[in-house]
A protein has these predicted regions:
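Hydrophobic alpha-helical transmembrane segments and their immediately adjacent juxtamembrane loops
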Residues: 130-223
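Extended amphipathic alpha-helical scaffolding segments in membrane-proximal extra-membrane regions
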Residues: 2-156
Length: 223
């Protein structure tokens, strides 16, 4: 977004902005037909054009978010980065639309006398105010959706991390038993049974594998 200042004179309307807005005003000049003998209708049509630009962009963000959030479990970090960018844009839109709506509503207040309005102009201002409020409501709804998606993604990531840590812990315990048995029987210590024969070797291997399997089975089942 970029700020625009409207200067309304008796014979002309002037817009001033820090950035070139050819993409906004050139289609307006080419396609919109509006009487220029009165400043109020021209100003309101220009505001309507700006509002339509916001409506188009918010609708595009809504479509892209609906497509990206069909499966929360398969969201990627890139999707979360995109949502953060959407959040920034939506907050910028709110920062622009809320003051604009306030200024429009003030034109209806005869105490301020900001702009001479006829009855049809007042109806157009009211319609624009309603449309702006709808866009504001949609922006706030999308921001809530982004917050919910990020919370859900964080919960999914926490669950995956806990599952990974549990599996690693079980694997560590399972590998500890064969290592411990190998260390014990590898010591130069006399045992009451033969530890040098082939049968003793396979017995130790069998006990190690059985113990590791039982521990893994127990902790994998205990969730």
């Amino acid at each position: 977004t970029t700020p625009i200042m409207f200067a309304l004179g008796k014979a002309y309307n002037v817009t001033i902005s820090r950035d070139p807005l050819g993409r906004l005003w050139q289609p307006f000049i080419d396609n919109v037909k509006v009487a220029t003998d009165r400043q109020a209708p021209l100003f309101l049509v220009m505001v309507e054009t700006i509002l339509q630009s916001y409506q188009t962009r918010v609708a595009a963000i809504n479509r892209q978010m609906r497509a990206a959030t069909t499966d929360i479990v398969n969201l990627s970090p890139k999707d979360i980065t995109t949502f953060v960018e959407y959040e920034r844009k939506l907050n910028d839109y709110l920062d622009a639309l809320i003051p604009t709506n306030t200024a429009l509503e003030k034109t209806l207040n005869t105490k301020f006398k900001l702009l001479p309005l006829r009855e049809e102009d007042q109806e157009m201002v009211e319609d624009l105010s309603v449309d702006i409020e709808q866009v504001i409501a949609r922006c706030k709804s999308l921001l809530r959706t982004i917050t919910n998606v990020r919370d859900s993604y964080r919960a999914v990531m926490d669950t995956r991390l806990n599952e990974t840590m549990r599996i690693l812990t079980v694997a560590t315990l399972a590998l500890t038993i064969p290592t411990m048995l190998a260390g014990v029987f590898g010591m130069n210590v006399e045992f009451p049974f033969d530890t040098h024969g082939i049968g003793a070797f396979w017995s130790i291997v069998f006990v190690s594998v059985l113990a590791a399997g039982l521990i893994s089975f127990y902790f994998m089942r205990k969730r």
